[in-house]
Design a protein with these regions (language model features):
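The substrate-binding groove and active-site-proximal loops of carbohydrate-active enzymes
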Residues: 1-11, 43-57, 127-143, 159-169, ...
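Glycan-binding loop/region signatures in secreted carbohydrate-active enzymes
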Residues: 1, 88-144
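Active-site-proximal helices and loops of the catalytic beta/alpha 8
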Residues: 64-70, 82, 87-98, 150, ...
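Short acidic catalytic loops
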Residues: 25-33, 47, 73-80, 142-170
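Alpha-helical packing segments of well-folded alpha/beta enzyme cores
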Residues: 9, 13-16, 59, 63, ...
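N-terminal structural segment of carbohydrate-active enzymes
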Residues: 1-76, 81-83, 88-92, 134
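Short capping/connector residues at structural and topological boundaries
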Residues: 39, 47, 52, 85, ...
Length: 247
C-alpha cells in the first residue's frame, strides 16, 4: 500500500555510514526524499522540501558531508515526468493554493495538459494522482534545470548526481539540459536514467534515443542484465541463454 510506513530516515542512514564504508559502498542511491503524500514519494508535492518524515534539509546536508568524508556519494531520484496531484504545483485538493487546478492564471498552469478544466488532464499511465508535466514548457525547465533550480539547489546541498525516473518518457532535449546543469556544478557529478529496455537501442517516436551519445546519460539502470542474472540464478536460463540475454 502507498500509505504503509516502516520507519527509517536520513539520520538513520548517517548512523550507518561507518558500516556502509566497511562494506566498500561508494554510492548511495536514495529513492525520492521530497515531500509527498505516499510512502514511495514518486508523487512529488514539493521539490524543494525534504519530506518531514525523513528529516530536514540540514539533515540532508550533514548526511552528504559525512558520506563524502568516507568516500561515499549520494545520488538522488529525480521524478520530473509528472508531479503529485496533491502538490503545490497541481493542487487538486486545494492544500497549497495557487496551483494549476486553482486557477488558469496560476504560474504552474502551463506545466500541465488539461482537457476539460480542471477535471480532465493527462496523467502518468492513467493514474489521476500523477498528472503529467510538459517538460518542454520554458517555465518548468527553468524551475528544474535552470539557474537556481531544483537540480542546482540539491547539488549545492551535497548531492553528487541524479537518477532520472522514467527517462524513456522524457524528451531528449530535456535530458540534455539536465545533464548540462549537473555537469556545470561538477564534471564528476553523475546522471543515470531509468530505461527498461536496452538503452543503446531504445526506440522513440523520432527514432533511436540518444542516451548513450555522450550528451545525455552517463549510464542507465540495466534491467535486461538484472533479469538475465536473476533468471540464471533461479535456473530459468542456462549459461548460454543467459550470455545471449546479456548481449
Amino acid at each position: 500500500s502507498p500509505n504503509d510506513y516502516f520507519g527509517g530516515d536520513l539520520r538513520g542512514i548517517e548512523e550507518k555510514l561507518d558500516y556502509l564504508q566497511e562494506m566498500g559502498i561508494s554510492c548511495l542511491y536514495l529513492n525520492p526524499i521530497f515531500e509527498a503524500d505516499s510512502n514511495h514519494r514518486y508523487n512529488t508535492a514539493d521539490y524543494r522540501r525534504i519530506d518531514p518524515m525523513l528529516g530536514t534539509e540540514e539533515d540532508f546536508i550533514r548526511l552528504c558531508a559525512q558520506a563524502r568524508q568516507r568516500g561515499i556519494r549520494i545520488l538522488l531520484d529525480g521524478v520530473f515526468s509528472h508531479t503529485g496531484s496533491d502538490s503545490r504545483y497541481f493542487d487538486k485538493k486545494g492544500t497549497y493554493g495557487n496551483g494549476a487546478c486553482d486557477s488558469p492564471s496560476s504560474p504552474y498552469y502551463p506545466w500541465y495538459r488539461f482537457g476539460r478544466y480542471p477535471e480532465e488532464y493527462e496523467s502518468w499511465w492513467g493514474f489521476a494522482t500523477l498528472p503529467n508535466v510538459e517538460e518542454t514548457e520554458q517555465s518548468y525547465g527553468a524551475f528544474i534545470h535552470g539557474e537556481g533550480g531544483v537540480l542546482q539547489h540539491w547539488l549545492e546541498a551535497g548531492a553528487s548526481g541524479w537518477r532520472l525516473d522514467v527517462a524513456d518518457e522524457l524528451p531528449d532535449c530535456f535530458i540534455r539540459d539536465v545533464r548540462r546543469r549537473i555537469k556545470a556544478q561538477s564534471p564528476d557529478n553523475v546522471l543515470l536514467g531509468e530505461v527498461w529496455e536496452d538503452c543503446s537501442d531504445k526506440q522513440g517516436p523520432q527514432g533511436r534515443r540518444g542516451y548513450v551519445n555522450g550528451d545525455e546519460l552517463d549510464s542507465a539502470m540495466d534491467y535486461p542484465l538484472r533479469r538475465a542474472i536473476l533468471d540464471f540464478c533461479a535456473g530459468k536460463l542456462d549459461a548460454f541463454d543467459a550470455a545471449e540475454a546479456m548481449w
